[in-house]
Amino acid sequence: MAELSEQVQNLSINDNNENGYVPPHLRGKPRSARNNSSNYNNNNGGYNGGRGGGSFFSNNRRGGYGNGGFFGGNNGGSRSNGRSGGRWIDGKHVPAPRNEKAEIAIFGVPEDPNFQSSGINFDNYDDIPVDASGKDVPEPITEFTSPPLDGLLLENIKLARFTKPTPVQKYSVPIVANGRDLMACAQTGSGKTGGFLFPVLSESFKTGPSPQPESQGSFYQRKAYPTAVIMAPTRELATQIFDEAKKFTYRSWVKACVVYGGSPIGNQLREIERGCDLLVATPGRLNDLLERGKISLANVKYLVLDEADRMLDMGFEPQIRHIVEDCDMTPVGERQTLMFSATFPADIQHLARDFLSDYIFLSVGRVGSTSENITQKVLYVENQDKKSALLDLLSASTDGLTLIFVETKRMADQLTDFLIMQNFRATAIHGDRTQSERERALAAFRSGAATLLVATAVAARGLDIPNVTHVINYDLPSDVDDYVHRIGRTGRAGNTGLATAFFNSENSNIVKGLHEILTEANQEVPSFLKDAMMSAPGSRSNSRRGGFGRNNNRDYRKAGGASAGGWGSSRSRDNSFRGGSGWGSDSKSSGWGNSGGSNNSSWW
């Protein structure tokens, strides 16, 4: 990585599910042994698919080791998670026996880079400042132990090769175990997914499912009553969370399902009808299923909003409010609500007051900024020279995966074609791709079959792709927050990464924010950027939530004018809160964009 960084610095440029529906009178009964024929489908079709279409190998999330292979089914007097899943019987959790083939499919093998869990700088997380504010903040954990974590979850964490909790996990586990709501603000790549999955699953394994309402009719519409609901802004992030949930629900009574727009709803309905205890969903598709009467939220104990600020930016606020406030979801105070994101400006914190009760605000690290594990380089490149500059960069890079961001779908296609013609293994992902094409492209990139992924904003937030060593902003975004989240695709889980940006006079609207980001992360600020900053009008960085400063990571209850009385202790580790000096008005934002449609696919 150091060698690559030096080379950059010296560049001369300026539904195959076999687990059918189980009738109520047979639920919980031993089932006849059948061969599991839906192993992971790894058919590599080569690279002649051009722009990342159908030529790469299939990664069918509906088959393989997914729901049908090892999970599925409710059970009348008890609760079961399919043939190889555990059961909840007479108030006790009875895990299923271990299955070596299932473990290889779910957790991989230690040398497999696609199942990466930690990096060479993981111990550096011990030095990251953490601040937790609110009443009676629990002491953080320092290692994965039982208690407070459930024993089965600890076994699954070990199988996933997680050796120590990240800062957000150190606090989220005891906070949830103590029945508190949580707003967690943590840097990209800091383990937020485990931050909510670990405590939610641990408590679910201990307490079991809630009793379902009395049946009204033969099968009560085969309605699902999940214990936990996790909402995410995009189908890719939802699928990623689901993949992680499958690891940590292994051998347990909890059956995980995922639903999102852009794919046939019939397959998703069939999965839900077979039982759903933990539901990962995009807001639009979840609204659709609620309207169809296929899901009830009456038994929800845990509500998780991941990438909450992005969901609101995308116009999902009306849909989220409808789900949380207008349907049959367990009310505030009777459920636990967890909000996770890399940024939580004041207006989002104000909105959280409607969803959370007596919550703890957790700020981890340089929130709203970039990781110091990422080396950032900004190069001055005119538009007509970008392809040549890109080839120079790629020639200097030999290992790992490279993620290239462009602003338009047309440019994604054009640049991918150009790279393929230059004999690079490239694929693309953007909003005009079908869901299956996007999944195949991501699978090819994760596996290394394609070493270059050209992407629009569809892949900018939340996706955790191991071994991304280099992020290139071929086109800089107009918003500095988008820049932060783009480059956060590298340097994840303690690993080091390189981020390179092509800058020219057309990027004047991001000058001040970019300068501030580089300065905060102790990165070199090139002279042309300093000159551009001096001549740029105004003094505010261009952020869609501008006006509050970059590090909007403090509890608004501490801000001037907000009532902070009665919140009690504030536990701080290594540092104190930083932040702007004014939070602006406490008003509902009305400019979140169009919320129409439940397909959840039109925003790209």
UniProtKB/Swiss-Prot annotation:
Q: Which residues carry this modification: Phosphoserine?
A: 215, 218, 263, 535, 539, 543, 572, 576, 598
Species this protein is from: Saccharomyces cerevisiae (strain ATCC 204508 / S288c) (Baker's yeast)
**Substitution effect: residue 166 to A:** Reduces RNA-helicase activity about 2.5-fold in vitro
Name of the protein in question: ATP-dependent RNA helicase DED1
Q: Motif location (Q motif)? A: 142-170
Q: Which gene encodes it?
A: DED1
- Impact of changing residue 162 to C on the protein? Slow growth at 18 degrees Celsius
Under Gene Ontology molecular function, one entry of this record is: RNA strand annealing activity
Question: Assembly state and interactors?
Answer: Interacts with the L-A virus GAG protein and the whole L-A virus particles.
What the entry lists under Pfam families is as follows: DEAD, Helicase_C
